Amino acid sequence: MSRIFIDVREPYEFATGHFKGAINIPPSQLLAGAKKLNDTPKDTEIILYCLSGSRSNSSMNILRQMGYTNLVNGINKSQVKAKYGVE
């Protein structure tokens, strides 16, 4: 099963650096931006991250309400990098 990394920081933050292949969907755009996930099975592992974990946590709750079941609040880039070995 594949993983999807969603960087929920604002676009200007995303532009300063993000994981290769990460999708940028800020919380304010999550409902509209979730179209990027249309073909994604609801049980795909989705790791969300931001700067401190607050935005990724609220975004995780929204995605859960949309039916996604395998969600991880990765907190921030450093913790995601340490746990998943992504660059």
Q: Model-predicted segments: where are they?
A:
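Rhodanese-like catalytic fold shared by cysteine-dependent sulfurtransferases
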Residues: 2-4, 8-47, 51-87
